[in-house]
Regions:
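Amphipathic alpha-helical assembly/interaction segments
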Residues: 1-148
Length: 148
């Protein structure tokens, strides 16, 4: 992980992206569009998956990244359950559900593996890396008192 500088480079993020894209295609299908509350919930959960991954990574510390990965994995779980409901009320076919479930399982497994790695890593994250040169001090803005 030491060489990863962008959250989009993680295999876990890529798997989540594939899964949420398929969920997006699913919720645009005609039978499902009629169930607006379900569509809204699935859209929010899909957005949450990718957003929490990115937000956690950008916070720079492994502890925070791990916490946001947990939120991300929770949203994957939510999205894994909602197609079950869709099958039960005959909005989607069992085969489509099984394909989605496999994608969700892959994403959750990769998120879990990344979380375990971060928890056992002796590195604290980008936030705590010592820089070879000091960070330059910010310049103070000059006061413009007396100017009209």
């Amino acid at each position: 992980m030491a060489n990863i500088t962008d959250f989009r480079d993680f295999q876990a993020f890529k798997a989540c992206r594939v899964f949420t894209r398929e969920i997006g295609l699913l919720i645009r299908s005609v039978p499902l569009r009629r169930n607006r509350s379900l569509v809204d919930q699935m859209e929010r959960a899909s957005i949450s998956v990718l957003s929490n991954f990115a937000e956690g990574f950008e916070r720079d510390g492994n502890a925070e990244f791990t916490r946001f990965l947990s939120f991300c994995k929770g949203s994957v779980g939510e999205l894994r359950a909602q197609p079950i409901y869709c099958v039960d009320i005959e909005l989607i076919e069992q085969e489509r559900y099984e394909a989605l479930d496999l994608m969700a399982e892959t994403a959750a497994r990769l998120l879990g593996g990344l979380t375990r790695y971060l928890k056992t890593s002796n590195k604290a994250g980008r936030k705590y890396v010592r820089r070879s040169q000091p960070i330059p001090k910010r310049r103070r803005r000059m006061s413009v008192k007396g100017r009209a």
